[in-house]
Curated annotation (Swiss-Prot):
Function (record text): In addition to acetyl-CoA (100%), the enzyme accepts propionyl-CoA (60%) and butyryl-CoA (30%).
Species name: Thermotoga maritima (strain ATCC 43589 / DSM 3109 / JCM 10099 / NBRC 100826 / MSB8)
Catalysis performed (reactions): acetyl-CoA + phosphate = acetyl phosphate + CoA
Subunit structure: Homotetramer.
UniProt-recorded name of the protein: Phosphate acetyltransferase
């Protein structure tokens, strides 16, 4: 339901998507669906013969897709170049290593840096849970610093605003809900909360530290006597590092059967940077989310 709203927001805007190394089955399926549902206009970079073969095998009804024929090793550079020149509006990773694509994206020659931290934001639609959860960062920053977490919160708030949340509630999550000097994450959480109170982080309500149960269950928060507007009502979860965030993301997807959409924000254009294990549906929703910000 929530993710379909993103699809509706992206539909019909004609945003051009540069797909770097599009010679991948799941990528082609997701991009075709995005084209069919008018979420974007794909431009496929990579070996034309292989891309055409995949299209003919999987989606033969897709006639005359725009393909820029090039060797796989050139696809990333040419796709980023197209985005840099304004020929395309946003970027998607295909059959290319994440590190290789982001190294090209961050090359100063292409002018796509903004000075902000680039981070992954994921929207999770969980069965029987009353609202979407926005989490960061399950796939980009290995061990984000305090300063980087400020930018992560800003990116998440932008996504929440697009989804209709005017003042989202942000929980900085760790293992416990009290400050413990032996656990630096809890001290960072308290600092972020105070920065929000002093107006250094705007447009949201930030509180922490919290354990996960305290921010998704009002009952759990009440049992522990936690009084906070965020307790049990969080819209955004800021996780301590990529390991915690990635484990939560995959637990929600594979165990709780959540649907998801992810995008990389912080550069001049968003990047669709999904995992090979992600489903065609996840890739499709990620294209839609990124198109909204393109």
């Amino acid at each position: 339901m929530f993710l379909e709203k993103l699809v509706e927001m992206a539909r019909g805007k004609g945003k051009k998507l540069a797909v770097a190394a599009a010679n991948d089955d799941h990528v082609i399926e997701a991009v075709y669906r995005a084209w069919r549902e008018r979420v974007c206009e794909p431009v496929l970079f990579g070996p034309e013969e292989e891309i055409t073969r995949i299209i003919e095998e999987l989606v033969p009804e897709w006639k005359n897709p725009q393909i820029i024929d090039c060797p796989p090793e050139e696809a990333g550079r040419l796709a980023v170049e197209a985005v840099s020149k304004g020929e395309c509006d946003f970027l998607m990773k295909g059959k290319i290593k994440t590190g290789d694509l982001m190294k090209i994206y961050l090359d100063e020659r292409y002018g796509l840096r903004t000075g902000k931290t680039m981070a992954m934001v994921s929207v999770m639609e969980i069965p029987d849970f009353p609202r979407p959860l926005i989490i960061s960062d399950p796939g980009m920053l290995i061990s984000p610093t305090l300063e980087q977490k400020v930018d992560m919160i800003e990116h998440c708030v932008r996504v929440a605003n697009v989804m209709g949340l005017e003042t989202p509630k942000v929980a900085v999550v760790g293992a416990i809900e009290v400050v413990n000097p032996k656990m630096p994450i809890t001290m960072e959480a308290a600092i972020l909360s105070k920065m929000n109170q002093r107006g250094q982080i705007k447009g949201c309500i930030v509180d922490g530290p919290f354990a996960l149960d305290n921010v998704v269950s009002e009952e759990a928060a009440k049992k522990k006597g936690i009084q906070s507007p965020v307790a049990g009502k969080a819209d955004i979860l800021i996780l301590p590092d990529i390991e915690a965030a990635n484990i939560l993301y995959k637990a929600l997807v594979f165990l709780a059967k959540a649907k998801s959409a992810s995008t990389i924000l912080g550069g001049k254009v968003p990047v669709v940077l999904t995992s090979r294990a992600d489903s065609e549906e996840t890739k499709f929703y990620s294209i839609a989310l990124s198109a909204v910000f393109a």
